Amino acid sequence: MKRHVAATLLVLTTLGVINAHVDIEAQDGRYFGVWQGKKHDVIGWLADHNNQLWRDCSAVQQLSNDSPAAEQVLSLIADHSPPDSRNASLVKLQQQGDWLLAELAFAQLNPAVVVLQAGPAGMRLPERAVWSGSTAPWQPGPRIRQHLAQQVPEAPATLLACYDPVTPGLR
């Protein structure tokens, strides 16, 4: 068999196998690759890796869970939607200037990511500055960052770009 015939057959066979096992499905304005019955957010995966490659997180601080800011965040969250929010535990806390981003876990509620602003009167939770629950089938990082950027446009873009989800429940 000639080489060009073998190469053509190999390409056609490969395309046939891909066509039989991989589909593209649209959902809420996004296209997902579907293989083995599971949706994969290829665009989100690329966006997440692009974000990790190009972001500069030198202005963002990682705060410890026993910092004074962490105590204020937990106190504010406990009062936000009692009684279930009273058992919040801080998974991750980041700060840029007077803005904070917290990832929280709860015993009874879905995990959440909140954006808060510190001021002279104390910590405040801006209106709609919360993501809660799973992002499936979307890639969690880009989906949560995009949501928070739309809901709290005054929050620093660098703070949002430097957030990477930790809690498995967000995936």
Predicted segments with their positions:
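A short, surface-exposed beta-strand/turn
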Residues: 111-131
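Ser/Thr/Pro/Gly-rich low-complexity linker/stalk segments immediately outside membranes or between
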Residues: 22-47
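Short extracytoplasmic
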Residues: 42-61
